[in-house]
Amino acid sequence: MKYLLLVCVEEPPEPPLETAEEIASWDVEGEDIKPWLSEVDGGGIRLFGSQVSKPANASTVRVRDGEMIVSDGPFAETKEWMAGFDIIECDSMAQAIEIAARHPVAKFGMIEVRPFRPLPRD
């Protein structure tokens, strides 16, 4: 089964990581993410993942009564913000939680684990 790991932090890294070189050398609060990536990528667990840009670069899109409404910024204004995500394939929620617990950001941020749900088919 596929699971989404939402990688959340309370504050963005300072300065924000924007260039490919900065992202490639990212050291998470003294915790190098490369060993975790090697484990989950090498084990065929992680299907895809990425960091995402800071909340100030977000746009929120709604359609109400046929009209598109675009707002600058994220959907919710909170201290926590999504810094990235990973899509993993595991046998169970328990295994997905174990993988999330080993993510370096779990030591100072949080990892929300959500199972994928199939879309209804005609």
Predicted regions mapped to residue ranges:
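Conserved, structured core segments of small domains
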Residues: 1-122
